[in-house]
Amino acid sequence: MNAKAEAKESRFDLLKWLLVAVLVVVAVVGNQYFSAQPILYRVLGILVLAVIAAFLALQTAKGQAFFSLAKEARVEIRKVVWPSRQETTQTTLIVVAVVLVMALLLWGLDSLLGWLVSMIVG
């Protein structure tokens, strides 16, 4: 990991994670408790609690490390050379052709073995 990503754990990290867990439980229980209310209000309540929980989680050492990992992953994704549409289509057609050939070979082998067993048995 990156040296910047390795943040020292605070003594309040456990308290923050417990608070995150409590917020998630409150969201789940609140959604069930207020099931008679319109769905819009329940979704808004869950979103508010989720944003608060995410903010608290990102304040911990593990949360900061996760955020740093996500930023580095985004940078790496931008470096990937993605195949063109033509390359993707050609590769897909090759895979389909190989699957069909293998299916025919296995079907033929199964038929041959079935015929041999039926000749031996009866």
From Swiss-Prot:
Which organism encodes this protein? Pseudomonas aeruginosa (strain ATCC 15692 / DSM 22644 / CIP 104116 / JCM 14847 / LMG 12228 / 1C / PRS 101 / PAO1)
List, alphabetically, the Gene3D superfamilies matched: Preprotein translocase secy subunit (1.20.5.1030)
**Localization of this protein:** Cell inner membrane
Q: Which InterPro entries match?
A: SecE_bac, SecE_sf, Translocase_SecE/Sec61-g
**Where would you say this protein principally sits, based on its record?**
membrane
Question: How does the record classify its membrane topology?
Answer: Multi-pass membrane protein
Which GO molecular function terms does the record list? protein transmembrane transporter activity
Identification of the protein by name:
Protein translocase subunit SecE
Pfam families, alphabetized? SecE
Q: Which UniProt keywords apply?
A: Cell inner membrane, Cell membrane, Membrane, Protein transport, Translocation, Transmembrane, Transmembrane helix, Transport
Q: Which domain of life is it from?
A: Bacteria
Record has Protein transport as a keyword: yes
Quaternary state and partners of this protein? Answer: Component of the Sec protein translocase complex. Heterotrimer consisting of SecY, SecE and SecG subunits. The heterotrimers can form oligomers, although 1 heterotrimer is thought to be able to translocate proteins. Interacts with the ribosome. Interacts with SecDF, and other proteins may be involved. Interacts with SecA.
Which protein family is it in? Belongs to the SecE/SEC61-gamma family.
Function description: Essential subunit of the Sec protein translocation channel SecYEG. Clamps together the 2 halves of SecY. May contact the channel plug during translocation.
User: Which PANTHER family does the protein's record reference?
Assistant: PROTEIN TRANSLOCASE SUBUNIT SECE
| Organism classification | Bacteria, Pseudomonadati, Pseudomonadota, Gammaproteobacteria, Pseudomonadales
